[in-house]
From Swiss-Prot:
Location of the protein in the cell: Host nucleus matrix
Protein name: Preterminal protein
Species this chain originates from: Canine adenovirus serotype 1 (strain CLL) (CAdV-1)
InterPro entries: Adeno_preterminal (IPR003391)
PTM entry text: Preterminal protein is used to replicate viral genome, upon genomic encapsidation it is processed first into iTP and finally into TP by adenovirus protease.
Chain positions of motif Nuclear localization signal: 338-347
Site (Priming of strand displacement replication by covalently linking the first nucleotide of the new DNA chain): S536
Gene Ontology cellular component annotations, sorted alphabetically: host cell nuclear matrix
Length: 608
């Protein structure tokens, strides 16, 4: 398959005009003589890349003819003799995310010799990391400094896939530092061409890393849906933790669109009315968190009671909760129809509930058993569940992609088992909350990398993912490593396979909270539960993680390492080939004389 000019431009960050001048060719079989020897071998290209052209930086610049980057040594107003297809796109992908640090190994080159084929590939290992402040979660559970962290924690819980310490006002693009091939603090943002849209436009529509990443490629309809889902979850959580006020009696007409009023009431940006959450038991608050996070799934905990008002039990002689249940479908359909979007398919309106004014049915000898009485809180949750489910059906396929976010199932199953065993205590709750949000970050980041490196068609066609690794380092308040974990996977599906392993591993560890060190007979079963793989870290580190008191963990450093390989293309432009031949000749001459090479952009006289 030949590399087309459009894919080349997209993956190198160059303009179509530059690619047209460059005239790329992938396979140089039977054309090797047109190029200098150093340009066609892996050893020669590695020498040129490091000492003459500095490809690790040059490939990030605008290489159009007569641009500032091409002035003087070694380009002399023309593009370089090679383009590393996908390298600039890789750096741009890493740069556009909230990593604190990004490091890239030295570029390596390999030769491919097959019948009628002679090619070169480039390979680089990227290591991107950032630190999350898990101490904020402990303070939340302990209710220390609550007034300072309430807004952040509430966003972290309800934004879905985000933590409080990564504020959205912080720009993602270019944040942190970048090191390349021994060069420190490389100003990547200044080198990269800004081809992509400004992601800050999404910040008024959704919280959180995952929401922002999903909206990155979403249309207006998906933005409306994702924002509405977030508001419904926010409203439900605020409803659960609101203080019950016996002086406020809610009169709820059975034919009103109560879901609109409910969402508006409990998504008030002012959190002052919810400050009394501090007086609630920590387990009650955490159960409310879990119930909101699990939407639209079933509630993993025992039924919860909400506050804010007392519900008038009957309206005009009718049971309000029962009437809400009967009119639920109609009310949800009308709620979704009122959103500013066009629905995927019009649904037939549900039949109206039967009027009680009809003639009374004949009395049966054995009347059917009445359904179990439902609480108002259960009906509210079931209504929100159904509304979110229908909204998710309206999402486009790309926005609905959840393969990296089904990790929550593992955590909900754990909390259900703990609930049945009566083992929900401070230690298990603390570890569940901390690992859930760590898994949120891992899922969000791996999904972002998978979307950009595997699902983006030009990249998936030409750039191969060889291996991926996630490293998790827990540190105490002094910055010392408490324990570290490593997960490795190989191949094209490494990102999704990593997520499955990390989520199952962390969820299984929750059940061991507070139980101390593993006994000899328990160790084998635990290793089977987490599906331990060889070359996935020291077993002693896993045992240390299981037995640790989680209050010692103040921060968690997450490192994402991945090795990618892409094609090297050669220029067919005779002028570029001639300049390269003369540059290599001068560089070889200076090297033999043990003299330094000219500085970048220096004006020198090339040999004929």
């Amino acid at each position: 398959m030949s590399l087309n000019a459009l894919d080349c431009a997209r993956l190198t960050g160059q303009t179509p005009y530059t690619v047209e001048v460059f005239r790329p060719i992938r396979n140089i079989f039977n054309r090797v003589r047109e190029y200098t020897r150093a340009s066609t071998t892996s050893v020669g290209l590695a020498w040129m890349s490091k000492y003459i052209y500095q490809y690790h930086r040059l490939m990030l610049m605008n290489l159009s003819p007569r641009e500032p980057a091409t002035e003087g040594w070694p380009l002399f107003l023309y593009p370089p003799p090679h383009l590393l297809v996908g390298y600039q796109y890789l750096v741009r992908t890493c740069n556009d995310y909230v990593f604190d640090t990004r490091s890239y190994s030295r570029l390596k080159y390999t030769e491919i010799h097959l019948p009628l084929q002679q090619k070169l590939n480039w390979t680089v290992m990227a290591n991107c990391s950032y630190t999350i402040n898990t101490g904020a979660y402990h303070r939340f559970i302990d209710f220390e400094n609550f007034e300072e962290t309430l807004a952040q924690v509430q966003q972290a819980v309800l934004a879905e896939r985000v933590v409080a310490d990564l504020a959205l006002i912080r720009p993602m693009r270019g944040y942190g530092t970048t090191n390349m091939a021994g060069d420190r603090q490389v100003p990547v943002e200044g080198l990269l061409q800004d081809h992509y849209k400004n992601l800050s436009q999404c910040q008024n529509h959704a919280w959180g890393l995952a929401d922002r990443m999903r909206i990155q490629n979403a249309g207006n309809k998906d933005i409306v849906i994702l924002t509405t889902i977030r508001k419904l979850k926010t409203a439900f959580f605020n409803f659960l933790v609101s203080p019950r006020n016996p002086h406020t009696i809610l009169s709820l007409p059975c034919d009103c669109l109560w879901l609109d009023a409910f969402m508006q009431k409990f998504t008030d940006p002012s959190l002052s009315q919810f400050q009394t959450i501090q007086s609630l038991p920590s387990q009650s608050v955490t159960k409310s968190i879990i119930s909101a996070l699990s939407l639209p799934g079933p509630a993993p905990c025992t039924p919860l009671s909400g506050g804010a008002f007392e519900l008038r039990p009957r309206e005009n002689g009718r049971a309000v909760t029962e009437e809400m249940r009967r009119r639920r479908g109609e009310m949800i359909e009308r709620f979704i129809d009122r959103l500013p979007m066009r629905r995927r398919r019009r649904r037939a309106p549900p039949p109206p509930p039967m009027s009680e004014e009809l003639s009374e049915p004949e009395v049966e000898a054995f009347p059917p058993a009445s359904p179990p009485r439902r609480s108002f809180e259960e009906e509210v949750r079931d209504t929100i569940v159904e509304a979110i489910r229908l909204l998710q059906e309206e999402l486009t396929v790309s926005a609905r992609n959840e393969q990296f976010f089904n990790f929550a199932i593992n955590f909900y199953e754990v909390i259900q088992r703990l609930e049945m065993l009566g083992n929900i205590n401070e230690l298990t709750i603390r570890r569940w909350v901390m690992y859930f949000f760590v898994a949120e970050h891992v899922a969000t980041t791996l999904n972002y990398l998978h979307h950009n490196l595997r699902l983006y068609p030009p990249c998936s066609r030409w750039v191969d993912l060889e291996l991926a690794q996630v490293v998790m380092r827990a540190r105490d308040h002094e910055g010392q490593v408490v324990y570290s974990r490593v997960w490795n996977e190989m191949g094209e599906n490494a990102f999704s396979q990593l997520m499955a392993r990390v989520s199952g591993d962390l969820a299984a560890t929750v059940e061991r909270a507070g139980l101390g060190e593993l006994e000899e007979e328990e160790m084998e079963q635990f290793m089977a539960d987490i599906a331990y793989h060889e070359n996935s870290g020291d077993v002693s580190e896993i045992l240390r993680q299981v037995a640790i008191n989680d209050t010692e963990v103040d921060s968690m450093e997450l490192s994402f390492r991945f090795k990618v390989t892409g094609p090297v293309v050669f220029s067919q432009n005779r002028q570029i080939q001639s300049i390269n031949r003369r540059v290599v000749a001068l560089a070889s001459q200076l090297r033999m004389q043990h003299r330094p090479l000219p500085a970048q952009h220096e004006q020198v006289q090339l040999p004929p």
